[in-house]
Structure formats: C-alpha cells, structure tokens
Amino acid sequence: SIIVDDKEVTTLSNREVPELRRKIGTVFQDFRLLPKKTVFENVAFAMEVLHKSKRQIRKQVPQVLSLVGITDKAHKYPDELSAGEQQRVAIARAIINNPTVLIADEPTGNLDPITAAEIMDLLEQINMRGTTIVMVTHAKDIVDRMKKRVIAIEKGKIIRDEEGVYGFKEGVNTLE
C-alpha cells in the first residue's frame, strides 16, 4: 500500500486525487521547463495553476530561488542556463507549494558528477526541512552516498528494502 498524509492513495476517489496531487512535487531528468518563460515565470507557474495571489507569488518565488541558489538567474530563460541550473529551476518549481512528498525521477541523470553532487546536497536540504524525497536512480554511487532507505525493484518485484545497510553490490542484500 502507498500512504501519503495518512491516506491510502490506491483507494482515493477521482475527486480526492487532485487534492493529493497538490501535495506532491515532481522533478524529472529532462527538467521539463517552459522554454518561453523565465526562471521566475517557470516557478511562479506552479503557484498560478493553484490560483495563488500575485502578492504570494512575488514573495515566495524569490525565497525559493534563493533556497536553490539561483536568485541571480530569475530573468533568464531555460536555454540560457546550464543543465545544473535548469535542474535547480525544476526543483524550485516542484517545492514552491511546500509539497509533503517530492518525487525525483533520475534528477542527476543529465548532470556531470560535481553538479550531481550539488543537486543531491540540495535534495538533502529539502528533506531536512520536512519533505519526503522519493528518488528513482540508477546511480549506485549516489545511493551509497546518501545513506537513506533503499528500495530496489527489479522486474516489478522488490528485491531490497533496507535502511542503515549500504554498499550497493550486485547480488548482495536482496530479498528472497
């Protein structure tokens, strides 16, 4: 079962799904930024679709851009940013509405090792502020570095579910 905010998500009604969706932020490997919008506008868009006030947007967007370290890029367009900066914009957009859960699908997949480490540090900061991070990755070095709960899935079956045991070696620590 999957439980978010004390609700079993597989039994939610169609009416309840949008409410739950507002509590989940999503970050993709390919950033999925809106190319004709600035950094500020990309992040603000996530608030606009929830009908947040312009005042709230003007206040919160700079705060989140500061948190992810790209305040100086607010008026740039996605094609003017490095891959790491684009991922920071995607993370800012995902967390602007204070989600309970952040789903990160290969958030370091298109990044060089140094930038990937910086993004992982940023996700760690977000987690320490109270957001649960669910990350999909094939980067075993990141799994080992983060030292968090690891759930490995192979061919649709959970083969590992551990916390506190690290070292991602082939054939080791799998469930029977």
Regions found by a protein language model. Give the residues of each.
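Catalytic Walker B motif of ABC-type/P-loop ATPase nucleotide-binding domains
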Residues: 102-105
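Hydrophobic anchor residue at the start of the ABC signature
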Residues: 91
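Helix N-cap at the start of a conserved alpha-helix in ABC-type nucleotide-binding domains
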Residues: 113-115
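Conserved signature/switch motifs of ABC ATPase nucleotide-binding domains
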Residues: 76-79, 97, 129
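Conserved ABC ATPase signature
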Residues: 77-81, 85-87
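Short coil-to-helix segment of the ABC ATPase nucleotide-binding domain corresponding to the Q-loop/switch region
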Residues: 37-44
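ABC ATPase NBD Q-loop/coupling interface
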Residues: 1-19
